[in-house]
């Protein structure tokens, strides 16, 4: 029988990107924490499949993959020049990059509905205008991304939701003036 499945370029793109992320980890760290490449793949697959449902024109799978690939090269350069990146830090950084714009996707946070999006940890919401895209969530996407990772990774035995959320917070733009310090002790 003939297959009725359509040619799915998004799945191919996701698989190829995750192959690269896994293989770069293996090239850098060898057999250290051999389960970590699978963590990258499983968290990355989850994030990319969710982001693939986004209707925001720019903050999509392609953008998230490009951010992860460039971020990985920056991290690899830091590792090669300083040697100061652990395998655990690597995994958290890559997962953070893959999840950094997940807050643009409608329906991902507990309490989201077809007409309302949760915008912070206090459960405040914003009404979604009829016909809006995920780009409407721009002012809230960092908080929503943090809510998502706290919900998704809260009980994970290896991935720290707190670390991922802190990294997502570092993507906020413009950079907040109040309380912001030039802390360069993390990624």
Regions found by a protein language model. Give the residues of each.
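Non-catalytic interface/linker regions that flank or bridge core catalytic/transmembrane domains
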Residues: 1-56
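His-Asp-centered metal-binding catalytic motifs of divalent-metal-dependent phosphohydrolases/nucleases
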Residues: 67, 90-109, 145, 166-174
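Active-site flanking loop/helix segments enriched in acidic
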Residues: 42-69, 127-135
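Amphipathic, well-packed alpha-helical segments that form the structural scaffold of globular domains
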Residues: 48, 68-76, 146, 150
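Divalent-cation-assisted or electrostatically stabilized phosphate/pyrophosphate-binding catalytic cores
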Residues: 116-143
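Alpha-helical phosphate/pyrophosphate-handling elements in metalloenzyme active cores
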Residues: 53-92
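"Short basic amphipathic alpha-helical interaction patches in structured regions
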Residues: 86, 108-118
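Histidine/acidic-rich helix-loop-helix segments that form or flank divalent-metal centers
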Residues: 94, 140-187
């Amino acid at each position: 029988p003939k297959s009725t499945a359509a040619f799915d370029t998004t799945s191919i793109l996701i698989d190829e990107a995750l192959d690269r992320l896994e293989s770069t980890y293996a090239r850098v760290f060898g057999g250290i924490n051999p389960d970590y490449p699978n963590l990258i793949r499983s968290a990355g697959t989850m994030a990319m499949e969710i982001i693939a449902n986004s209707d925001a024109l720019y903050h999509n799978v392609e953008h998230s993959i490009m951010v992860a690939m460039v971020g990985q090269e920056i991290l690899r350069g830091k590792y090669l020049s300083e040697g100061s990146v652990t395998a655990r830090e690597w995994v958290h950084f890559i997962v953070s990059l893959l999840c950094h714009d997940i807050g643009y996707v409608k329906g991902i946070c507990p309490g989201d509905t077809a007409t309302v999006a949760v915008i912070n940890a206090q459960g405040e919401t914003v009404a979604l205008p009829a016909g809006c895209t995920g780009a409407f969530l721009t002012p809230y996407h960092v908080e929503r991304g943090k809510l998502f990772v706290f919900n998704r990774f809260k009980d994970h035995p290896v991935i720290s939701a707190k670390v991922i959320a802190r990294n997502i917070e570092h993507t906020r733009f413009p950079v907040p003036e109040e309380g912001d310090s030039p802390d360069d002790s993390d990624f």
